[in-house]
Curated annotation (Swiss-Prot):
GO terms for molecular function: Atg12 conjugating enzyme activity. InterPro entries: Atg3/Atg10. It holds the Pfam family Autophagy_act_C. Its EC number is 2.3.2.-. One of its GO terms (cellular component) is nucleus. Forms homooligomers. Interacts with ATG7 and ATG12. Keywords: Autophagy, Cytoplasm, Membrane, Nucleus, Protein transport, Transferase, Transport, Ubl conjugation pathway. It is an enzyme of class 2 (transferase). Disulfide bonds: none annotated. One of its GO terms (biological process) is autophagosome assembly. The gene is ATG10. E2-like enzyme required for the cytoplasm to vacuole transport (Cvt), autophagy and nucleophagy. Acts as an E2-like enzyme that catalyzes the conjugation of ATG12 to ATG5. ATG12 conjugation to ATG5 is required for proper localization of ATG8 to the preautophagosomal structure (PAS). Likely serves as an ATG5-recognition molecule. This is Ubiquitin-like-conjugating enzyme ATG10.
Amino acid sequence: MSFKSQLLILAQKLSKGGISCELIEFDECILKLEWHTELLDKNDSLLYEQEEDDILSLMNPMITMHAWIRDSPSFEVPQFFFQPYANGSDPLTKMEQIFELLEGSSQNLAYDALAIGDCPGTVGIAWYIHPCRTRDYFEMLQIDKEDPKYLSLWLLYIHQVLSPLTQPIIKAVDDAEKS
């Protein structure tokens, strides 16, 4: 099954779960996603942070996520680019801001996996999970690109790195696969 076909199937699953999806084609196929997530603290109450010098102040705990999925030509694995926005329009561009949003276990993985750079789905920059870390994950799983659960399993890795920001996409895929 081609990567484009897998993206189309994934887009159907995500759309059913309320994730906005658009397949865009530049020189390659890219699935553009958008969703909103409400951050909760460890006591399941809304997360509000006090403003500090360079750390994010969440006046509104709603984070808007823009993401792009493509096939990395050099590493031959899916690649996940993302840009979170606080308060509807403030892009989070500092590593400290991203780490503040992640669960403790995700922070360790994110430290080794996250980078910021040119996003092939936009004319700007975005955060991304480096494809060499994704390749390591697939080597550990020993899963073939033709496996129908290839992208679903890959999303579990993305969720390990970016939890709780990616919870809505995990829920959408889980719900679609149960029905």
